[in-house]
C-alpha cells in the first residue's frame, strides 16, 4: 500500500504542520507551494493521496482537481479549506474529490480520511493488477480455446 501524501497549500505554516503530522503518523508527505508545482511532477509523482487547499493564488484547488482529472489522474483527492460552504463542497464532490474538510479540522479526522483514501487506492491497484493478469492469460489462449470460452 502506498503511504505517500501530496500536500498542496500556499500557506507555508500549514504545509509544515501537515508535513510534521503526516511524517509522525507514518506517512511519506511531499509538499508543494502551488498547484502548478504539483502539476509539473504529477505525471511521474509516486501514487498516493492528494491533500489540497481550495484557495490558492494562481490555480485554485478545484481547478487543480479539474486539470488532474482531464489528464486521467485518478488519485484520491482531499480538499481542505478555511472558507467552506455548501455550494463549494457540492462543487468539489461533483469534481470527483474523495472528501472535503473545513479548517480547522481534527488531526484524527484528516488522518482517517487519508487512510481511507489510500486503502481505496490499494484496492484499485489490486483490481487493476488482477485484470492485467487475466488479460495476459486470455492473450495466451488458442483460437479454439477462445471459441470455447465464448
What is each model feature region?
Residues 85-87, 101, 105-114:
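C-terminal output helix
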Residues 132-150:
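Helix-turn-helix DNA-binding segment
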Amino acid at each position: 500500500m502506498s503511504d505517500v501524501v501530496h500536500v498542496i497549500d500556499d500557506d507555508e505554516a500549514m504545509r509544515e504542520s501537515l508535513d510534521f503530522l503526516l511524517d509522525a503518523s507514518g506517512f511519506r508527505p511531499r509538499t508543494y507551494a502551488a498547484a502548478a508545482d504539483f502539476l509539473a511532477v504529477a505525471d511521474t509523482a509516486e501514487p498516493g493521496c492528494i491533500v489540497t487547499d481550495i484557495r490558492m493564488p494562481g490555480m485554485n484547488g478545484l481547478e487543480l482537481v479539474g486539470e488532474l482529472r482531464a489528464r486521467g489522474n485518478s488519485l484520491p483527492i482531499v480538499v481542505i479549506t478555511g472558507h467552506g460552504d455548501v455550494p463549494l463542497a457540492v462543487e468539489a464532490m461533483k469534481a470527483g474529490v474523495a472528501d472535503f474538510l473545513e479548517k480547522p479540522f481534527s488531526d484524527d479526522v484528516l488522518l482517517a480520511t487519508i487512510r481511507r483514501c489510500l486503502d481505496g487506492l490499494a484496492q484499485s491497484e489490486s483490481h487493476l493488477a488482477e485484470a492485467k493478469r487475466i488479460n495476459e492469460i486470455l492473450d495466451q489462449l488458442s483460437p479454439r480455446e477462445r471459441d470455447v470460452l465464448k
